[in-house]
Amino acid sequence: MKPKHYPDTISSPDFSSLEKEIIKFWQENKIFEQSVEKRSKDNCFVFYDGPPFANGLPHYGHLLTGFIKDAFARYQTMLQKKVERRFGWDCHGLPAEMGAEKELGISGRTEIEKFGIEKFNNYCRTSVMKFSSEWEKYVNRQARWVDFHNDYKTMDRSFMESVIWAFKQLYDKGLVYESVRVVPYSWACETPLSNFETRLDTAYRKKTSKAVTVAFELLENPQQFKQKCKLLAWTTTPWTLPSNLALAIGKDIEYCAVSVHSSVSFQHVTLESREKETWIPLSRTGMTEEGTETVTEDNEVSLVNNEIYIFAEDYLEKFIGHCEQNNIPYENCNTKLKADDLAGLSYKPLFNYFKGTKNAFRVFIADYVTGEDGTGVVHTAPGFGEEDFYLCQSHDIPAICPIDNSGRFTAEVSDLTGIHVFDTNDAIIKKLKEQGNWFKTEQYIHNYPHCWRTDTPLIYRAMPSWYVAVTKFKERMIELNKRVNWIPTHIRDGQFGKWLERAHDWSISRNRFWGTPIPIWKSDNARYPRVDVYGSIAELERDFNVKVNDLHRPFIDSLTRPNPDDPTGKSIMRRVPDVFDCWFESGSVPFAQVHYPFENKEWFESNFPADFITEYIAQTRGWFYTLFVLSTALFDSEPFKNCICHGVVLDVKGQKLSKRLNNYADPMEVFDKYGSDALRFLMLSGSIVCGGNLFLNKEGSSIRDVLKNVMKPIWNSYHFFTMYANADGIKAEVCKDYKSTIDSYMIFKCFEAVESIQASMSNYNSQEACKILIDFFEVLNNWYIRRSRERFWKSNLDQDKTDAYNVLYTVFYYILRAAVPLLPLITETIWQGLKYKEISVHLADFPQLERYDSELIAKMDLVREICNSALSIRNTFNIRVRQPLGSMTVYHQSSCSFLESKPLSVVIPKFSPVIPMRDTGTQKEKKWSNAEMKTSMNEYQEMIKDEVNVKELKLVNSLEGIASLELKLNFPMLGKRIPDKVKKLVQYVKEGKWKQVDNEQVFLGNESESYIIEKDEYELLLKTNSEYSSVFGDNKGIVILNTALDDALVLEGLARDVVRLIQEARKQADFHISDRIRVIIKTEDEKIKRAINTWGEYIREQTLSLSLEINIEIGDNFYSKEYQDLIVGIELNC
C-alpha cells in the first residue's frame, strides 16, 4: 500500500461545510491575532472602519463593504504590514433615538422629557447595541477579520472627549459661530438637518403638492394703471402663505398686464373628469366639454370689473389658456412693465396674522427670481425659505416662523393653531377663495427632500444653530482632494469635487438628547455676556469641581457655575441644550477612536492620513465629506490616501433590497448554501467595486455561477493533484528547475499571474485581480493539466512524472498566497491540505518572485490562441475534438502593417514585496518576424497537432487571397470630435480610400481632401474568405481547418469515442483511476468493430486495460453500461 501524503478529496465538496471548519480552525488557533502580532508596529497600514449602527442586522451592502475592507487588509498584511482592524459602532443620533422611541412606545420631545432624559438615554445606551452579537456572527461567517474586543463606540467617554476637543479647536480657530438661518428641518424627529443630509441616498423623491396661484392686491398701482391691480404669485407650499411678508420679482424679467373686465359671479366646482378644482360662471353650470360639473361648495366670488392682473410675460400663454378654459373674460392690455415699475410698491396682506410687521408687505427685486417657473413673482416667507430669509434680512424684515417643533401652527395663526402645516393647505386655499385672492390650484409633481430616518417630507425653518464655517476653508479642501487616489477616478473632480465646490457652512447642532453634548456654556444674563468652550474632561472638572464620569445628558446639563464676569454673582453659566450632529462624530473617527490627543498622540500623527477607506458612493456626500471637513480644519490634511467608492446591491429589477419587497435571501442562508467565498468573489470581481451596481436575485443564481466557474475549477485542480499524488504515493516539492517547455511555461505563467495580481491589488483593483485569477486557472486546468494528463496516468514514477507533480505543487505554493485576499477560505483549505510550512496561508507572506522568461510565455500564449481558434471552428461546425482531421493551416504575416496594431510584449519584471501604484516596470516590445514565427510553430507543432487533433500542420507566411482588413469606425467618438465629417468618412471607407499610417492613426481620403483618425476612433478587423476559418491573437493571423474525413480518420475518431465510454463506465463503477481492468465491448456496428481491431492497443493503453475483447458474454462480475451503439463491460483485474 503506497503512503498517502495528502487528504482524500471528493470532486464536488460542500464548500459551506469546509468554510465552517476553517473558521473554527482560525478561532481555535488565533490565526487573526497571530497575523497582526507578528508584524512590526513601525510598519502600519491604516484603514478606517466606518461605524455602522448596531440596532439592525447587516445587509448585503454591509457585507460588500466588509469584503472590500477585508480583502485589502489581508493583502497588506501579507506585504508584512501591521493592519489593526478595530471594529466601530455608531451609537448616537437619530437612528438610536427613533429606535428607542418606537420600543418605548413614546414619540416626540414632550413625551421624552416626560419619560425622563436620563432614563431615555440609558435605554438608548443599551438598545443601540442589542444586535452587536448578531453582527459578530455575520461578520465572522463572511470570513472577515475584525477586532471586536478592542472596538470603539461613539458613546464611549474617551471618544466623546476627543470630539469636544475637536470642537474647541475649531472654535479657537474662529471656525465656529451661532446664527439663525433657514435649515432643513425634520418635524418627525424635531430637529434640524444639515444640507448634505438632504442629499443622502433617496432623500429627494417624488411628491405631489397642491400648487396654488395667488392674487396679491396692490395698495399702490403702477403709474400705467388706475384700476385695481393684483400681482399673481405661484407657490407649491400654500401652508407658508399665512407667513408671507414680501413679494420678490426679477430684475431682468419683462412683466405684462391683463384686464379681466366683466362683472361675473363664479361658483366653486370640481370637474370630475379632470379631478381638478376651478371656478365657472353661474350662468354656465351644467355640462361642459370637460365632463359633468358637480357643485361641491356654495362659495361665490366676483371678479370686479376691469381688475388688472400682472405677471411675467412668459406666463401669459398659461394665463390666457386658463381663462379661456374656464370662460373668464379677459383683455390683454398690451402694456409692458419693468421690475423698476413694480419695486417698492406695497400690497395688502393676504391674512391679518402679522399685519403690523415692520417694513413688510412690499415688492422687492431679487436676483434668484426667473420667469421660467411660475409667474415671475415669488411669494416670500422669510421663516420658511433660505432665499426669502436673506432677502427680508436685507430689508430689515424679521423672520417670522409660527410653528412649533412638531410642525404645527402656534397661537399666532389663531384659526389653524395645533394643526400640522401639511394638513392646512385645503383650509388656506378655501380662505383665499373666499377673500378673492385665489386664481388657480393644480397638482404639481416634483422632487422634494425627505427625512433620511423617517421618510417624512422636510420643511425649511428659520432657527438658531451652531455652524462650522466650511466656506472659510473650502478652497483648501478642494486642493487637498487632488491628493487622494479615488476609485473610480472620476469621483475626484466629479461627484466629490463638485460637492466640495458647492459646500455650505455646516449646521452641527441638534436639539436632541442622545449624543455628544456641544461643550458651550453661556451666561444666563445678557447684561453680563460670557461664553466658555471646553475641550477636555480635565477642563470641566477644574471649572465645575466635580468628577466627570459621563459626558451625556442630563449629567452634563447639571454642571453650572457662577459667571466669573458678573460682579453681582447672580448670573449663572449654563450649557447650551444642543448635542452634536452624529455626522460630526463620524467625521472624528480618525482621531477619536484612539482618544487623540489625550492618548496615542505620536502614533496618530505618524499614521495620519489613513492609507485606505471604502464605503458606498453616496458617502461622498456623507462620511467622506465630514472626514474631509474636520481633517482639513484640524490638521490641514486630507483624511485618507486611497478611497474606493463602491456601488449598491440591487435586485434584478433594479430595486433596493428590502424586507417589504421580500426580494433578497438572508445572507446567513446564502452562506449555508453556497459559502461566503462565492459571494465575496462575486462582489470583488464585479463593477460594483468601482462605482457600478450589482444585481442579485433572491435565488442566488449569480452566486451559483461563481461556484461553477471559479470555485469548482480551483478545487478541480487541487482534487486532481491529491487524487493522483496519493495514488502514486508521492510527496511533492517546491521546484526550482523546470526541464520541459510546458513545465517552464506553467511556472512562469504562475509568476506572471502573481505579479499581475499584486499590481492590481496595489492599485486597489480587485476586479482586475479576480479576472487574472480566473484566467490563470483556465490555463492550469485546460492547458497544463490536460496537456500533461498522460504524464500523470503512466504507471512508472519517473522523473518526468515527478516533475509534473512538483510543478503543480509549486504553482499552488505561489498562486494560493496571491489569491488569499480574494478567496480566504478555499485557499486555506487547499494550503492546509498540501501541507506547506506555515500552518495557515494567512501567516505566510505574499510571494517573492524569481525572474521569469516572458518570451517563453508569449510563445506559448500564441500557441494557445491558435489552438483556441481552431477549436472554435470545430465547435461552430459541431465537429467533436475526438474526431481527428487531416490538416490545419496557419496563415500569418507579421510584416503587414495592419498586423502590428498590438505586437506581442516581453515584460522584464521588477521584483519587490510591493509593486508601486503606478507600474514602473520596463516593457520591451517584440515583433515576430516570419522566421521566428516559423521557428515557434516548428517548436510547438506537435503540441498544436495533438491539441487540435489534426494530422498535419502547415504554416504560410502570407495572407494574400485568404484575408483582408476591414476598417470599422467608432461613431460615438468621431461624432464628438468631427460630427459634420462622419458621413464623408463612411463614404471613404466604402470606397476603400484609407490606409493605416502607424499603430495609432489611420489616413482617409484623397489628394484634395484627407482626414487622420486616432486609435480610439476606429477598429481594424481581419476578415477571411473561408467559412472554416478563424482569426487569432488580435488580428495576428488566420487558422483554417481541413474538415474532409476519410475512412482512416473516421475509424480513429470512433476508437477515441470507445476510450471515452470505457472511462465513463470506470467512473460510474467507482473504480480507482489506477485500477487495471478487463474490458468487453458488445456491438453490431461494423465500423466500431473495425475501429477496435485497428486501434486496440491505443484503447488498452488509454484505459489501463489488460484485455479488450469484442462480442463475448459479459459475466455477472462485470460492471456493464449500455450506450447507443454498444455495451461496455468492465471488471477489476484482481
UniProtKB/Swiss-Prot annotation:
Record's catalysed reaction(s): tRNA(Ile) + L-isoleucine + ATP = L-isoleucyl-tRNA(Ile) + AMP + diphosphate
Cofactors demanded by this protein: Zn(2+)
Binding residue positions for ATP: 659
Chain positions of motif 'KMSKS' region: 656-660
Molecular function in Gene Ontology: aminoacyl-tRNA deacylase activity; ATP binding; isoleucine-tRNA ligase activity; tRNA binding; zinc ion binding
EC class name: ligase
Localization per Swiss-Prot or TrEMBL: Cytoplasm
A Pfam short name: Anticodon_1
UniProt superkingdom: Bacteria
Primary site of residence: cytoplasm
Sorted UniProt keywords: Aminoacyl-tRNA synthetase, ATP-binding, Cytoplasm, Ligase, Metal-binding, Nucleotide-binding, Protein biosynthesis, Zinc
GO cellular component, one term: cytoplasm
Chain location of the short sequence motif 'HIGH' region per the record: 52-62
Enzyme Commission number, as recorded: 6.1.1.5
GO aspect biological process, one term: isoleucyl-tRNA aminoacylation
InterPro entries xref list: aa-tRNA-synth_I_CS, aa-tRNA-synth_Ia, Anticodon_Ile_ABEc, Ile-tRNA-ligase, Ile-tRNA-ligase_type2, M/V/L/I-tRNA-synth_anticd-bd, Rossmann-like_a/b/a_fold, tRNAsynth_Ia_anticodon-bd
PANTHER family: ISOLEUCINE--TRNA LIGASE, CYTOPLASMIC, SOLEUCYL-TRNA SYNTHETASE
Domain comment, as recorded: IleRS has two distinct active sites: one for aminoacylation and one for editing. The misactivated valine is translocated from the active site to the editing site, which sterically excludes the correctly activated isoleucine. The single editing site contains two valyl binding pockets, one specific for each substrate (Val-AMP or Val-tRNA(Ile)).
Family: Belongs to the class-I aminoacyl-tRNA synthetase family. IleS type 2 subfamily.
Subunit and interaction comment: Monomer.
Function: Catalyzes the attachment of isoleucine to tRNA(Ile). As IleRS can inadvertently accommodate and process structurally similar amino acids such as valine, to avoid such errors it has two additional distinct tRNA(Ile)-dependent editing activities. One activity is designated as 'pretransfer' editing and involves the hydrolysis of activated Val-AMP. The other activity is designated 'posttransfer' editing and involves deacylation of mischarged Val-tRNA(Ile).
Protein name: Isoleucine--tRNA ligase
UniProt source species: Wolbachia sp. subsp. Brugia malayi (strain TRS)
